[in-house]
Amino acid sequence: MILFYVFVVLALVSGAMVIRAKNPVHSVLFLILVFCNTSGLLVLLGLDFFAMIFLVVYVGAIAVLFLFVVMMLHIRIEEIHENVLRYLPVGGIIGLIFLLEIFLMVDNDYIPILPTKLSATYLTYTVYAGKIHSWTNLETLGNLLYTTYFFLFLVSSLILLVALIGAIVLTMHKTTKVKRQDVFIQNAIDFQNTIKKVR
């Protein structure tokens, strides 16, 4: 239960910092932290496969895409600070409506706020998974990835590595004052014409 509350508190604080952070890059990093804490909650619930898919899809694809888009757009933070106050009333009204909807959704017979007369007889079920000795989802997936489909797994990893390096190259700021090496030009140089013996 302690880990559950730790993940919940970190997810809520990170979600608030996504909105409150002044730097857009910091907002994306806090969003990644929200996804990681949510994956921790899914692991505690026994949904290990969903936790892994959550990390792969949201953190590995969407959050990294947001990060590179923010880095490439050259967002001016000063303009964002000037326009923050004009959106506060509308944001406050939307937040209050959302909070009211949460209370209306939770306060019912199935999910009461105060469990005084909770009768969970309709929620009882029998778990047959614990009665059969079998592998977990992660063990089965790992066994298939690293034995049967290991070649495809390596190829997909190389493709992701090339895409990551390409995104970093695209977001680099090219200036005239910075000295860089051009490997293609260096390899294409004819050393017989450049190096001469001096007697």
Curated annotation (Swiss-Prot):
Keywords, A to Z, come to:
Electron transport, Membrane, Mitochondrion, NAD, Respiratory chain, Translocase, Transmembrane, Transmembrane helix, Transport, Ubiquinone
Under InterPro entries, the record lists: NADH_UbQ/plastoQ_OxRdtase_su6 (IPR001457), Nuo/plastoQ_OxRdtase_6_NuoJ (IPR042106)
GO cellular component terms, A-Z: mitochondrial membrane
Q: Which Pfam families match?
A: Oxidored_q3
Q: Does the keyword Phosphoprotein apply?
A: no
Extract one GO molecular function annotation from the record.
Answer: NADH dehydrogenase (ubiquinone) activity
Enumerate the catalysed reactions.
a ubiquinone + NADH + 5 H(+)(in) = a ubiquinol + NAD(+) + 4 H(+)(out)
Please give, as recorded in its UniProt entry, the membrane topology of this protein: Multi-pass membrane protein
The entry's localization annotation reads: Mitochondrion membrane
- Protein's job: Core subunit of the mitochondrial membrane respiratory chain NADH dehydrogenase (Complex I) that is believed to belong to the minimal assembly required for catalysis. Complex I functions in the transfer of electrons from NADH to the respiratory chain. The immediate electron acceptor for the enzyme is believed to be ubiquinone.
Q: What is this protein called?
A: NADH-ubiquinone oxidoreductase chain 6
Organism, per UniProt? Marchantia polymorpha
Lineage summary: Eukaryota, Viridiplantae, Streptophyta, Embryophyta, Marchantiophyta
The gene behind this protein is ND6
